[in-house]
């Protein structure tokens, strides 16, 4: 049942904070109503106290269920029974072996020798299972985020690959144009040289120094023209 806010030192045994809409089990432990509902949200029963595993709340939904004291007495009687492998009642199987996870009755635990197997209450294992489930959900979310980032990286790589291919095609086209221009200018230069050579044969009295200076000037103008054209094409 719901209780008013208790003293300052009364905290919820699950969230370790002051209880909100506090409820109290008959064993004395206090909890937030939301914490208890969330703790047993996926369980059909039994409903022991989340802190001490007392079955006071289970008796509220099962009035015919024997109290914890009588169940402990049944465990003691089972422990004193001589037959270890005999059929055990459901009330006696309240422990789980840490080694293999099978139910462990008190008779088996007492007959295990000087070093009995480690055991834990079932409700502790249920709580650990809920914690593991939360960890799995976090790992699944991180995995989905990593997949999204991987997809974004692949998309960006595809875009940059397209840009690189476009620049490569443009550079190849400019190179072909420049090469064709050089071939054309080379043919034009050879034709001019042949004309100058024919003119020099007709004019044997011309000064060789003048003809050399004229040829050198033509070569300089051609080199300057080629250089300017190459720079203009590279800067496009």
Swiss-Prot record:
Post-translational modification: Ubiquitinated; undergoes 'Lys-48'-linked autoubiquitination in the absence of growth factors and MAP3K1-induced 'Lys-63'-linked polyubiquitination. 'Lys-48'-autoubiquitination leads to degradation by the proteasome, while MAP3K1-induced 'Lys-63'-linked polyubiquitination results in the stabilization of the protein. 'Lys-48'- and 'Lys-63'-linked polyubiquitinations occur most probably on the same 3 C-terminal lysine residues (Lys-195, Lys-224 and Lys-225) and are thus mutually exclusive. Other sites of ubiquitination are not excluded. Arginine methylation by PRMT1 stabilizes RNF187 by facilitating K63-linked ubiquitin chain formation, and enables dimerization, c-Jun interaction and subsequent AP1 target gene expression.
InterPro entries (UniProt xref): TRIM/RBCC (IPR050143), Znf_RING (IPR001841), Znf_RING/FYVE/PHD (IPR013083), Znf_RING_CS (IPR017907)
Annotated Gene Ontology cellular component terms: cytoplasm; nucleus
Pathway where this protein functions: Protein modification; protein ubiquitination
Zinc fingers (RING-type) by residue: 12-53
Alphabetical keyword list: Cytoplasm, Isopeptide bond, Metal-binding, Methylation, Nucleus, Phosphoprotein, Transferase, Ubl conjugation, Ubl conjugation pathway, Zinc, Zinc-finger
Cellular localisation: Cytoplasm; Nucleus
MF annotations from Gene Ontology: ubiquitin-protein transferase activity; zinc ion binding
UniProt modified residues of type Phosphoserine: 200
UniProt cross-link Glycyl lysine isopeptide (Lys-Gly) (interchain with G-Cter in ubiquitin), position: 195, 224-225
Modified residues (Asymmetric dimethylarginine): 98, 109
Function: E3 ubiquitin-protein ligase that acts as a coactivator of JUN-mediated gene activation in response to growth factor signaling via the MAP3K1 pathway, independently from MAPK8.
PANTHER family: E3 UBIQUITIN-PROTEIN LIGASE TRIM (PTHR24103)
Quaternary organization: Homodimer. Interacts with JUN, independently of JUN phosphorylation. Interacts (via C-terminus) with TRIM7.
Name of the featured protein: E3 ubiquitin-protein ligase RNF187
Species annotation: Mus musculus (Mouse)
Gene: Rnf187
